[in-house]
Amino acid sequence: MEPHRPNVKTAVPLSLESYHISEEYGFLLPDSLKELPDHYRPWMEIANKLPQLIDAHQLQAHVDKMPLLSCQFLKGHREQRLAHLVLSFLTMGYVWQEGEAQPAEVLPRNLALPFVEVSRNLGLPPILVHSDLVLTNWTKKDPDGFLEIGNLETIISFPGGESLHGFILVTALVEKEAVPGIKALVQATNAILQPNQEALLQALQRLRLSIQDITKTLGQMHDYVDPDIFYAGIRIFLSGWKDNPAMPAGLMYEGVSQEPLKYSGGSAAQSTVLHAFDEFLGIRHSKESGDFLYRMRDYMPPSHKAFIEDIHSAPSLRDYILSSGQDHLLTAYNQCVQALAELRSYHITMVTKYLITAAAKAKHGKPNHLPGPPQALKDRGTGGTAVMSFLKSVRDKTLESILHPRG
């Protein structure tokens, strides 16, 4: 995907546990906490009222009165992750409370300093990332019940009501559907090392089924997310301050830096799932798309980024299949690539509905109950990309990866 990575092939068997990837939940954080220690009650009290405070244009005033708290009393990974989730939501709400016409240019030190501190502890940037919005931001209503949307709720929220909850929780279910695929690519990588062609074939078949299940689950967006609400009411709170015309200079983190800092907004490209699939299948994207995707890895938990890099460093699946001369392996590989291309085509139809069509509709008059839709990113993803050309390029490069028998 990018030229500057060392091309060292590893022969060490992979295991999910060593990358803090759950056997049951994949990249989702199992047993996310809902409360921080009492010392951080000032954060939680505001975070739990976030939608109401933003709607009343009172969030900035409440944040400005917050005490400056150190992160030293956060114990363990889950408390750190919840703190990052809470502070990221406070930050996005603070910056975008008045919409894109009046974004906050300075993040006050009582929010900026602890946010940067916990971000450094976790190896994450000080902005809302996919890890916050989705991977950490879910809990079961009934702990013994199934992982399905009726039994899930978010921990922290923005304005957007049920559509916002649906967007987050359907995305969490997509991550859950990826778990068999993540396990399959580990099994396949280890099968190449053994080598065991039968185990490799079975793993490729499981990967294809997982990708197809991801596509089906993504379709639940239609049931739970209203396009008008997503476009005009939710999307702005996922927007960053890099490649965003509404904030060309970036955001000043008071007490952290003398210059404004620039970070990309939340993006599906920050999900580790498709990066891992691409590396395993040997899919190479165009320089522009590849550079953006590679940069998004810095917005992932470091252990998840390391997983992608180790998949990249593993022996090449494509080379192994071509050298094996086994048509059934080549067919199974191509079915995985085809399924991935179909997933990406479906994603394009979703973006067309929730971004392109919704933007055109908003241009001709917004519903009275929604704020004015953001214009600065009207044809761009919240990560700052020219979204349709990016998605089509990624889909087309996936299709170009179809293998043909040698000879």
UniProtKB/Swiss-Prot annotation:
It is an enzyme of class 1 (oxidoreductase). GO terms for cellular component: cytoplasm; cytosol. The keyword Iron applies. One of its GO terms (molecular function) is heme binding. Keywords: Dioxygenase, Heme, Immunity, Iron, Metal-binding, Oxidoreductase, Tryptophan catabolism. Binds 1 heme group per subunit. The keyword 4Fe-4S does not apply. It catalyses: L-tryptophan + O2 = N-formyl-L-kynurenine. InterPro entries: Indolamine_dOase, Trp/Indoleamine_2_3_dOase-like. Pathway: Amino-acid degradation; L-tryptophan degradation via kynurenine pathway; L-kynurenine from L-tryptophan: step 1/2. It comes from the Eukaryota. GO terms for biological process: 'de novo' NAD biosynthetic process from L-tryptophan; immune system process; L-tryptophan catabolic process to kynurenine. Its EC number is 1.13.11.-. Detected in liver, small intestine, spleen, placenta, thymus, lung, brain, kidney, and colon. Also expressed at low level in testis and thyroid. Not expressed in the majority of human tumor samples (>99%). Activity is inhibited by D-1MT (1-methyl-D-tryptophan) and MTH-trp (methylthiohydantoin-DL-tryptophan) but not L-1MT (1-methyl-L-tryptophan). Its cofactor is heme. Heme binds at H347. Belongs to the indoleamine 2,3-dioxygenase family. Catalyzes the first and rate limiting step of the catabolism of the essential amino acid tryptophan along the kynurenine pathway. Involved in immune regulation. May not play a significant role in tryptophan-related tumoral resistance. IDO1 and IDO2 are 2 distinct enzymes which catalyze the same reaction. IDO2 affinity for tryptophan is much lower than that of IDO1. 50 % of Caucasians harbor polymorphisms which abolish IDO2 enzymatic activity. IDO2 is expressed in human tumors in an inactive form: tryptophan degradation is entirely provided by IDO1 in these cells. IDO2 may play a role as a negative regulator of IDO1 by competing for heme-binding with IDO1. Low efficiency IDO2 enzymes have been conserved throughout vertebrate evolution, whereas higher efficiency IDO1 enzymes are dispensable in many lower vertebrate lineages. This is Indoleamine 2,3-dioxygenase 2. The gene is IDO2.
